[in-house]
């Protein structure tokens, strides 16, 4: 049986999904309340496109090339999942990459790090879940160059293609 993702997005809610997953024996499938949406009404639903950020200590010649190459691989309807491995010294997501994800028709972003340009993200009505805010750019601080590999966010294992809600 096929389901319309957009229809399910409006019919389901996180509590019932957690109850069902618990009943199936998957008891650690919810991200904690440390990661929140920009707007409380925001719902994202779609397959995960995973990536990992690594802390760096020097400014590369072309600092955004690696992340641009990763985002360019994002497919329509996918959720851009970015794990920072506890690197909270900068924002790893903002208006520039929101524009890129939106252009690729990504369904939203889930990151365990910081975001910036929040006013612009709100004006774009861009669905993003994040840990907090930080005005500092990721250039020379964090590089995203690994993608479509299994990741762990907030203790929850996420594989490429896993559905995020």
Language-model segment annotations:
Residues 1-160:
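Feature captures the catalytic cores and cofactor-binding loops of soluble hydro-lyases/lyases
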